[in-house]
Amino acid sequence: ESDFARSHPGGSLGRRLLLRVEDIMHTGEDIPAVPQGTALSQALMEMTRKGLGMTVIVDRHRHVMGVFTDGDLRRALDKEINVHRTTIDEVMTRNCATVHADVLTGEAIRIMNEKRITALPVVSGDKTLIGALHMHDLVRAGVV
């Protein structure tokens, strides 16, 4: 596989076999994240500002506790919750899918397809949030 990728780096298969998540992920201030206990209304503002269709919920050590997505928002609104009185912990998806930065983009695509999601938190070995990856990043990189 890697010989093929090195021989054909210009094609999407070659990029999928060479490009790593860390090469295209969002980092630093571009990562949508809020601490546990944040009001849902504030989490929605963070999600809107960062434009990835999700926000990651972290503890005080930046370990990933869950994720809140556009889909979670639709489900919450169906329950007619008060976005100002509800905390993100009450509506987030726990045990969310994540990906490591050194993983090939092809593996990130596989996870997104399997879980039917469009964005992933990127974590270090101890589940510390270090980035975010959206399907659009993969499209822009020519991987899909």
Show the residue positions of the predicted features.
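Oxyanion-binding "anion nests"
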Residues: 23-62
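Short loop/turn microsegments at loop-to-beta-strand junctions
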Residues: 52-53, 117-119
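Tandem CBS (Bateman) regulatory domains
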Residues: 1-30, 64-118, 125, 129-144
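Short beta->alpha connector loops at strand-helix junctions that form conserved
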Residues: 58, 123-124
